[in-house]
Amino acid sequence: MDKNIIIGAMTALITPFKNGKVDEQSYARLIKRQIENGIDAVVPVGTTGESATLTHEEHRTCIEIAVETCKGTKVKVLAGAGSNATHEAVGLAKFAKEHGADGILSVAPYYNKPTQQGLYEHYKAIAQSVDIPVLLYNVPGRTGCEISTDTIIKLFRDCENIYGVKEASGNIDKCVDLLAHEPRMMLISGEDAINYPILSNGGKGVISVTSNLLPDMISALTHFALDENYKEAKKINDELYNINKILFCESNPIPIKTAMYIAGLIESLEFRLPLCPPSKENFAKIEEVMKKYKIKGF
């Protein structure tokens, strides 16, 4: 298997709601907008997609919509398929594979605090259950669980279809250490604030929140960096500084959904509790920053 298969500029899709349900028409339109603006892959039902509060039926529907919308294009679908119960993660991975996803993104098990051996066995079971690429997802700030460098490398070497890791720990030193010990690994940035540092230190892509709003800029940044044109990549990164900062003024995906609503890209500013709309103060701050960016709605 080609372990390079899903890299480049990828978008962690939001999940739009309308009257308490997934707004399927808006979801498909959002994905089409990504396709039209140079994104290499979309990532449905991850953290940004509020996967934790979707029903299993909604989770499956979002994957099906993403696959159907991307059919016949060059854009790949890297489907969220994580759980803190291994059997459930395996089931989600199998569903994604059977319904046409090109690969899966699997978050580290949260809440139950597994050992490194437990993490290894968890991911090995997932990898053995499907024959599509698997990207590990390390985000200890949300899961309370850190996948160690040694465990990531062991999984990469032992499991043919585990091709890399989405790193959202904010730890650049860890990223550099990973590539120093296993340069074949595909390191993917999971934080917009450090996309450029990761790409300029050997990273092979990003899974971006900001690209929901500005897919063309994230695509350009990523591809300039992958082509080793770091001057142009840095220029775009600097232009994105203010929007990247404001899009994390509250818990993701609250600010990005708010920005999408302000831009007219989604019809309703709805969340699933316990997430809720931003404070009036932060809404105004998001609106102010967005005036600097030319963003068109539907």
From Swiss-Prot:
Cross-referenced SMART domains: DHDPS (SM01130)
Compartment(s) where it occurs, according to its Swiss-Prot or TrEMBL record: Cytoplasm
Positions annotated to bind pyruvate: T48, I207
Pathway(s) this gene product operates in, as recorded in its UniProt entry: Amino-acid biosynthesis; L-lysine biosynthesis via DAP pathway; (S)-tetrahydrodipicolinate from L-aspartate: step 3/4
Example GO molecular function: 4-hydroxy-tetrahydrodipicolinate synthase activity
GO cellular component: cytosol
Superkingdom: Bacteria
Pfam families: DHDPS
EC number: 4.3.3.7
One example of a Gene Ontology biological process annotation: lysine biosynthetic process via diaminopimelate
Site (Part of a proton relay during catalysis): T47, Y111
Keywords, sorted A to Z: Amino-acid biosynthesis, Cytoplasm, Diaminopimelate biosynthesis, Lyase, Lysine biosynthesis, Schiff base
InterPro entries registered for this protein in UniProt: Aldolase_TIM, DapA, DapA-like, Schiff_base-form_aldolases_AS, Schiff_base-form_aldolases_CS
Recorded catalytic activity of this chain's protein: L-aspartate 4-semialdehyde + pyruvate = (2S,4S)-4-hydroxy-2,3,4,5-tetrahydrodipicolinate + H2O + H(+)
Lyase keyword on record: yes
Positions annotated as active site in the UniProt record: Y137 (proton donor/acceptor), K166 (schiff-base intermediate with substrate)
Record's function text: Catalyzes the condensation of (S)-aspartate-beta-semialdehyde [(S)-ASA] and pyruvate to 4-hydroxy-tetrahydrodipicolinate (HTPA).
Family the UniProt entry places it in: Belongs to the DapA family.
Subunit structure: Homotetramer; dimer of dimers.
Protein known as: 4-hydroxy-tetrahydrodipicolinate synthase
Native source species: Campylobacter jejuni subsp. jejuni serotype O:6 (strain 81116 / NCTC 11828)
UniProt lineage: Bacteria, Pseudomonadati, Campylobacterota, Epsilonproteobacteria, Campylobacterales
